[in-house]
Amino acid sequence: MQPIPDVNQRIARISAHLHPPKSQMEESSALRRANCRAKGGAPGFKVAILGAAGGIGQPLAMLMKMNPLVSVLHLYDVVNAPGVTADISHMDTGAVVRGFLGQQQLEAALTGMDLIIVPAGVPRKPGMTRDDLFKINAGIVKTLCEGIAKCCPRAIVNLISNPVNSTVPIAAEVFKKAGTYDPKRLLGVTMLDVVRANTFVAEVLGLDPRDVDVPVVGGHAGVTILPLLSQVKPPSSFTQEEISYLTDRIQNGGTEVVEAKAGAGSATLSMAYAAVKFADACLRGLRGDAGVIECAFVSSQVTELPFFASKVRLGRNGIEEVYSLGPLNEYERIGLEKAKKELAGSIEKGVSFIRS
């Protein structure tokens, strides 16, 4: 027979779910008392998703709930967080899920987290470039990063909010102002460019995409996305026509999805998949796994620009090493110059947003 305290806890837990006060959110003292699983959750890392109710955030939350490295999953948004939290929390995996609604709960969502994933912001619409998103998303990223600087300055930050070429510099400037900036812990997520490159190259070569690795460097918009097809693994040769086709399709993959959805959304599902793939790499790095290498938009000395996307090795402190570009062919060298010219303006735009 179960001891009486256990029975009471179980009854309280059921009652909290059947009769939630307003919403099943972290602010509820009844739910906090009932959520005894959280005290002894599965070993792992604490992860927060900021923008968890959005088009990327929802599938991202679902996939992170499935990750065995996650012990606690915090879902934050300014709208609809209670519903997403309730839905995701029913999945029979180890991570304990907690929801947080609105600016007043941002600090609670962030406190004690190991990894912060930020897909918050408005999505792309037909005819809209990533730079068109700047005016709205820049302010959102600024506010969220101010919270991160205050509540979990040692967390690894995976920034998805577009335009990444500008929002990463914004985040860096916010952290600098707060005195918490660690360039090893701020990473712009460009994994979707790599995922697309692997997929499209595999189609041309007739291979399984899981067996293909294409380094994608530069940035995360248009011509700043530079796939290094000369460094594809397994080693492969391409005709000039194939190189032009692949480069163009990789650079414009986001537009391809926006147009195909005809106003109904952007690349939310593939982005969520790519974000989870990158987050998993960060968590494996935090765990101490060796040889965790992915591409990301980070503080860099690879070029004369202060930020650049290239391969990085991930570890317990975030970025352990930033790799050089390696040998480039003539087509890639020309593409690199175009990418740097475009990137310089985007980076300055982000820096100026905070400094001005």
Curated annotation (Swiss-Prot):
Q: What Gene Ontology cellular component terms go with this record?
A: chloroplast; glyoxysome
Binding-site residues for NAD(+), renumbered to this chain = G51, A52, A53, G54, G55, I56, G57, D77, N137, I160, S161, N162, M271
**Residues of the transit peptide:** 1-36
Q: What's the name of the protein?
A: Malate dehydrogenase, glyoxysomal
Per the record, the GO terms for biological process are: glyoxylate cycle; malate metabolic process; tricarboxylic acid cycle
> Where does this protein chiefly localize?
other
Tell me the Gene3D superfamilies matching this sequence. Lactate dehydrogenase/glycoside hydrolase, family 4, C-terminal (3.90.110.10), NAD(P)-binding Rossmann-like Domain (3.40.50.720)
Keywords, sorted A to Z: Glyoxylate bypass, Glyoxysome, NAD, Oxidoreductase, Peroxisome, Transit peptide, Tricarboxylic acid cycle
Q: Where does substrate bind?
A: R124, R130, N162, R196
Q: Say if the entry is tagged with keyword Oxidoreductase.
A: yes
The UniProt similarity line reads:
Belongs to the LDH/MDH superfamily. MDH type 1 family.
| Record organism | Citrullus lanatus
**What's a Gene Ontology MF term here?**
L-malate dehydrogenase (NAD+) activity
| Subcellular location, record wording | Glyoxysome
Q: Which Pfam families match?
A: Ldh_1_C, Ldh_1_N
Task: Name the catalysed reactions.
Answer: (S)-malate + NAD(+) = oxaloacetate + NADH + H(+)
Disulfide bridge positions per record = none
Q: How does it assemble?
A: Homodimer.
Q: Which residues form the active site?
A: H220 (proton acceptor)
User: What top-level class of enzyme does the UniProt entry assign?
Assistant: oxidoreductase
Q: What is its EC number?
A: 1.1.1.37
